[in-house]
């Protein structure tokens, strides 16, 4: 993702090297975490909360849209967010980084992600395989493209395609909904074998529970490389300096698409995210060791040497 690394110099200036041997300020004990209502971010944020709480921190989670979370970090009402999907959110995030309002981690917490428009496989087999094909199926689709929550960067990019009449989509309507609401609509369409175009992404159990295909030929409308994505951690601009121990944990907190998908299946089956996180840590002690290497308990000895 070349345009992500274009801003690496800016991010590096904001995320200075940590020194976990120094005692953190008392204010660092409270960790204010923003969580978007996306299952992947719920899973990773739950893992971070469980680990931080075990290290003696007091972690508070605020569930809100990505815009509210980013504004909360800018306004010093929140400390961090594990759900910056790049390039989908780059237009929102980069200006805030350049203005010194937020900071982005030096490395992503997830690679090999993907996010773009998708269709059920039966519709793909009927010939709706590319972005350019969508307009040909307008009547069957009811002139609708199904996105996620209102105000999301994803929806803004889909709406931009419509506003510019890109791919002949000028007369289409974007249907905004929550992740759960959108997927419920997809399942209803699947049961009727009805036509539907929706926003899909990896990691997510939808890739297993739904017979679906991603569209190609996006012409970078939702980012280069047909929706290839990475996920990054966002913090307060001075967080690495003020709370280097937490920052070290965040720098080391990286996930795989397979691991996230496994946790997401359990969450979507009705389990509480924190319970899923605890079970994951119990079954994967090597992850805990990797994430907490060189990280100290708050006000105490190192958790791992």
Residue ranges and their predicted role:
Residues 78-82, 153-219:
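Ligand-binding pocket segment of bilobal, Venus flytrap-like solute-binding proteins
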Residues 48-55, 138-172, 282:
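Ligand-binding cleft/hinge of the Venus flytrap
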Residues 25-40, 57-62, 142-146, 250:
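Short, well-ordered beta-strand elements
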Residues 45, 65-100, 181, 185, ...:
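Pocket-flanking alpha-helical
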Residues 38-39, 57-72, 173-185:
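Short helix-initiation/N-cap motifs at beta->coil->alpha
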Residues 253-305:
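C-terminal functional modules
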Residues 114-125, 228-242:
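A bilobed periplasmic-binding-protein/Venus flytrap-type ligand-binding module shared by bacterial periplasmic
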Residues 101-150:
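A conserved helix-loop-strand patch within extracytoplasmic ligand-binding domains
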